[in-house]
């Protein structure tokens, strides 16, 4: 369950930002994760809740939003969402090429915003 280490990293980043801005309370953290990032949202949410339970971050809301996969064809440069949406080797709807696509989005994992007091 690598979500535990992801939660630890998120909490370290959150604590750094809180210190940087002189804030004492975390209200909400929004995390954006790509469909190909291998993050299990329920596991990350549970890890976040457990790790913040007895801290000043207890009760903070973790909002997660998934970014869909977007590929760019290496042959015709068309951008498309594969079907199924987790397929990295899908035929390009423009030219039919199946291999060598560039992942434009879908692998990211980052904090989009923090709501602090």
UniProtKB/Swiss-Prot annotation:
Name of the molecule in the record: Hydrogenase maturation factor HypA
Pfam family of the protein (one): HypA
Keyword Zinc attributed: yes
Keyword annotations from UniProtKB, A to Z: Metal-binding, Nickel, Zinc
UniProt family annotation: Belongs to the HypA/HybF family.
GO MF term set: nickel cation binding; zinc ion binding
Domain of life of the organism encoding this protein: Bacteria
Gene Ontology biological process terms in this record: protein maturation; protein modification process
